[in-house]
């Protein structure tokens, strides 16, 4: 439906648009501010803007249409194409954003409700338990005994298995002092696992004449299997460091070679005797000051060492580390003072 709307100014006009030639969609009103000028002019979300102040908006870019609307004088004249309001029973094909939003919210609500009902049906105890009268439903208890444990749901699938024997189809609940199990066949009575009695044991279940229930002996294979499963799940875990230490100690007790241990776990007694009794390296002795050289040593000849500070000329005290030394008798001199003590250069011997 084509119509013309005059919005009284000045700007801002109180509505937002979307679309344009760059979006490949027509320019359309997406939001109208409450108690705004566009609301007073009956501008609605979903209206397609055909012309702005008489100028066609079909080829306008989005920014161009925004600029023309903002800079428009008062009144702002918009030629619109408004779709007819859909009836309550038919909303397909309608382009109104309000109707589309309502329809989307309704679909989301329906989807959420269906999922919540599905979760509740899976999580409710009634959905997991067999219906009354079904061949897998346990018989009702008229008066439960005091101290008996409720039937565990973790073994209901075992109780409902048709391929297992009647004595093996049970659900077990392990409360100390009273252990209870239920047969999964219709018409059978409950199976009670009782502690061992001093009397003779029997491998077959006996019938209790008073309560009409079956008494299962602890020597049965089903009871042993359930006990092994419980013990296997409750087995303590051992750390890898403790396991390595235990293996090393067992190897030493057997007289074998101990296994490799990390440095933080290795005992001091496992070190080799040669390493434990090794003496520290021998320190060189300075031939000038006759003290031990702890750090850096200057090697003059085989077996003759000096401190870097003692490696000096015997005449002027100049350090000979970067210059070399000259022997004159049994003393070290620099080149200058060594030449003064020898007239002939052939008598000099230089050693760097």
UniProtKB/Swiss-Prot annotation:
Modification Phosphoserine, positions: 124, 127, 129, 134, 137, 143, 161, 197, 203, 213, 266
Subunit relationships: Interacts with alpha-actinins ACTN1 and ACTN4, FLNA and MYH9. Interacts (via LIM zinc-binding domain) with MKRN2.
Gene Ontology terms for molecular function: actin binding; metal ion binding; muscle alpha-actinin binding
Modified residues (Phosphothreonine): 126
Ranges of Polar residues composition bias in the record: 81-95
Pfam family, one: PDZ
Function: Probable adapter protein located at the actin cytoskeleton that promotes cell attachment. Necessary for the migratory capacity of epithelial cells. Overexpression enhances cell adhesion to collagen and fibronectin and suppresses anchorage independent growth. May contribute to tumor cell migratory capacity.
Top-level taxon: Eukaryota
InterPro entries per UniProt: PDLI1-4/Zasp-like_mid, PDZ, PDZ-LIM_domain, PDZ_sf, Znf_LIM
Localization per record: Cytoplasm; Cytoplasm, Cytoskeleton
Name of protein: PDZ and LIM domain protein 2
Keywords from the named record: Cytoplasm, Cytoskeleton, LIM domain, Metal-binding, Phosphoprotein, Zinc
GO cellular component, one term: stress fiber
Major localization listed first in the record, in broad terms: cytoplasm
Chain intervals with Low complexity compositional bias: 117-135, 258-275
Xref: CDD domains: LIM_Mystique (cd09449), PDZ_PDLIM-like (cd06753)
Domain called PDZ: residue spans: 1-84
Region of interest (Disordered), residue spans: 69-95, 108-141, 170-214, 253-275
Coiled-coil segments: none
Domain LIM zinc-binding: 284-344
BP terms from Gene Ontology: actin cytoskeleton organization; heart development; muscle structure development
SMART domains: LIM, PDZ
Originating organism: Macaca fascicularis
């Amino acid at each position: 439906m084509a119509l013309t709307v005059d919005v009284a100014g000045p700007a801002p006009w109180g509505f937002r648009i979307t679309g344009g030639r760059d979006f490949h969609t027509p320019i359309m009103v997406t939001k109208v501010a409450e108690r705004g000028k566009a609301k007073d002019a009956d501008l609605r979300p979903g209206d397609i803007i055909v012309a702005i102040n008489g100028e066609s908006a079909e080829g306008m870019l989005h920014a161009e249409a925004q600029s023309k609307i903002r800079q428009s004088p008062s009144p702002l004249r918009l030629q619109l194409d408004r779709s007819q309001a859909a009836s309550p029973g038919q909303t397909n094909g309608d382009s109104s954003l309000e109707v589309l939003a309502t329809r989307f919210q309704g679909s989301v609500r329906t989807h959420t409700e269906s999922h919540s009902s599905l979760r509740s049906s899976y999580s409710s105890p009634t959905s997991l338990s067999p219906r009354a009268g079904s061949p897998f439903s346990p018989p009702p208890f008229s008066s439960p005994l005091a101290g008996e444990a409720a039937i565990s749901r973790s073994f209901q699938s075992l109780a409902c298995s048709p391929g297992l024997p009647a004595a093996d189809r049970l659900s077990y609940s392990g409360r100390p002092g009273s252990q209870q199990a239920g047969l999964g066949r219709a018409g059978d009575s409950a199976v009670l696992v009782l502690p061992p009695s001093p009397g003779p044991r029997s491998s077959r279940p006996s019938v209790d004449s008073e309560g009409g229930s079956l008494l299962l002996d602890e020597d049965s294979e089903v009871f042993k299997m359930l006990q092994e499963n419980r013990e296997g799940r409750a087995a303590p875990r051992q750390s890898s460091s403790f396991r390595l230490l235990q293996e090393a100690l067992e190897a030493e007790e057997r007289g074998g070679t101990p296994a490799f241990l990390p440095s933080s776990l290795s005992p001091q007694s496992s070190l080799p005797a040669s390493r434990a009794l090794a003496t520290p390296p021998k320190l060189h002795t300075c031939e000038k000051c006759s003290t031990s050289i702890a750090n850096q040593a200057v090697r003059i000849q085989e077996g003759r060492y000096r401190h870097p500070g003692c490696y000096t000329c015997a005449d002027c005290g100049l350090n000979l580390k970067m210059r070399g030394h000259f022997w004159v008798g049994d003393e070290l001199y620099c080149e200058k003072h060594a030449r003064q003590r020898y007239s002939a250069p052939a008598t000099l011997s230089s050693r760097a």
